[in-house]
Amino acid sequence: MKKKKIGLLVMAYGTPESLDDVEAYYTHIRHGRKPSEEALEDLIGRYKAIGGISPLAKITKEQAHKLTDSMNNIFTEYEFTCYLGLKHTAPFIEDAVEEMKRNGIEQTISIVLAPHYSTFSIKAYNDRAIRLSKEIGGPVIESIEQWYDEPKFISYWADQIKETFTEIDDKEKAVVIFSAHSLPEKIIAAGDPYVEQLKHTADLIAEAANIQNYTIGWQSAGNTPDPWIGPDVQDLTKDLYEEHGYESFIYCPVGFVAEHLEVLYDNDYECKVVTDELNAKYFRPNMPNAQSAFIDCLAEIVSKKVKEIVDKDLVLNNN
């Protein structure tokens, strides 16, 4: 029996693969407006501080291909083909959709490598893919909109936190800060669920890890005139120290799924500068990256969508 072909569109933010690519990447983020020399040098300096370039590009590719392999092992009746689509670097989301069209893919499942839904993130990615696919007569795209409460995602972070706490002597003097990328405050007034979803993720992980001292914070805010969601994790660290005298800070950037600039610089450098100033200890559990536990998590999420599509098709065919 011939296997049914299904596209697996894995979308992510993207990152420059060399320092020479930083300007084009930054310009794309700024909707075609080149950054000032000062802003460009600042960003390049951050990349240099983490070793020259972010590991994100390599990790994202590994996540996408391992997920595809896992799906092909789970569903022997389907043949999944991986298409990587990035927001700000090649291969762009549009490149992936056009390639699926050329390859004759008629049905696709899309997943964004970000757990929390926002109009700025997951919706924007899926809208770009679906809009172009409709324009060119490409595949029908079934989108996964969010997975912030996926049990295997929660258990991954709970296990990491439990492991981290084995390194801490005075656990009563430790606090966990769950964080995600800050976004403009205006999304809250518009009813965006992003903030509440992060809170829910934090509550679920805290319960699973059996921790009492935890809170949420925001990081990596953009440099724009509009106010962004706070508190920033660095300010939050200082406030928590002053109010509670915590001696150990465990940073869990659960809004991200891989090591990249925002984690390796904004957390591992900037937050550690703050904890060092406070004479407190800095901890940051391992990011999911392409670890088998996280790939299993992603495969579970996509598998649920496959079964949802199959059930929907059965209902339609029986009517």
Curated annotation (Swiss-Prot):
Its EC number is 4.99.1.9. It comes from Bacillus cereus (strain ATCC 14579 / DSM 31 / CCUG 7414 / JCM 2152 / NBRC 15305 / NCIMB 9373 / NCTC 2599 / NRRL B-3711). One of its GO terms (molecular function) is metal ion binding. This is Coproporphyrin III ferrochelatase 2. Keywords: Cytoplasm, Heme biosynthesis, Iron, Lyase, Metal-binding, Porphyrin biosynthesis. Coiled coil: none annotated. It catalyses: Fe-coproporphyrin III + 2 H(+) = coproporphyrin III + Fe(2+). GO terms for biological process: heme biosynthetic process. Its main location: cytoplasm. Belongs to the ferrochelatase family. Fe(2+) binds at H181, E262. One of its GO terms (cellular component) is cytoplasm. The lineage of its organism: Bacteria, Bacillati, Bacillota, Bacilli, Bacillales. Fe-coproporphyrin III binds at Y13, R30, R46, Y47, S54, Y125. It holds the Pfam family Ferrochelatase. It is found in: Cytoplasm. It is an enzyme of class 4 (lyase). Involved in coproporphyrin-dependent heme b biosynthesis. Catalyzes the insertion of ferrous iron into coproporphyrin III to form Fe-coproporphyrin III. Pathway: Porphyrin-containing compound metabolism; protoheme biosynthesis.
